[in-house]
Swiss-Prot record:
This is 8-oxo-dGTP diphosphatase. GO terms for cellular component: cytoplasm. It comes from the Bacteria. Homotrimer. Belongs to the Nudix hydrolase family. Keywords: DNA damage, DNA repair, DNA replication, Hydrolase, Magnesium, Metal-binding, Mutator protein. Its cofactor is Mg(2+). The gene is mutX. It is an enzyme of class 3 (hydrolase). It comes from Streptococcus mutans serotype c (strain ATCC 700610 / UA159).
């Protein structure tokens, strides 16, 4: 079965907004520091999903964002191949949701030089580097087995 989702990196110029997934029961991401995002709803475009998920999880309103790439995660959850649209947001407004109102985890602005020190999925360290380095548009595939990265490849598309 196919699952479509967005991954959204929010950048304030010196930090990325990450979520420490520490609130949701039976969460595949439990304990990890990840970007915000989520599953596309019926009839929703990736752009609409990204904007909705960012608002729901952070209360920030996206003014402009860049479509950075697509990542495939075959069989990431049992029986589900995940296809994720990756966005980077630099232009936003609003006030960050309070910790008590956040349902999935604790949000934190993480300085660029500390992003790679946070515990997360092995492949996410690669994505963090691409986002921080403003890499060209990419198509990637990360294969996990029992939460371990066992294969990966990426193609960057130069402008």
């Amino acid at each position: 079965m196919t699952k479509l989702a967005t991954i959204c990196y929010i950048d304030n110029g010196c930090e990325l907004l990450l979520m420490h997934r520490n609130k949701k029961p039976n969460d595949v991401h439990e304990g990890k520091w990840i970007s915000v995002g989520g599953k596309l709803e019926k009839g929703e475009s990736p752009d609409e999903c990204a904007r909705r998920e960012i608002f729901e999880e952070t209360h920030l309103i996206v003014k402009q964002m860049d479509f950075k790439g697509i990542i495939t995660f075959p069989d990431f959850t049992p029986g589900h191949d995940w296809y994720t649209y990756v966005f980077k947001v630099r232009d936003f407004e609003g006030r960050l949701i309070s910790d008590k109102d956040s349902r999935e985890g604790t949000l934190e602005w993480v300085p660029y030089n500390q992003v790679l020190t946070k515990p997360t999925w092995e492949g996410d360290y690669e994505i963090f580097k691409w986002i921080l380095d403003d890499a060209p548009f990419f198509s990637a595939k990360f294969v996990y087995q029992e939460q371990k990265l066992v294969d990966k490849h990426v193609i960057f598309y130069e402008k």
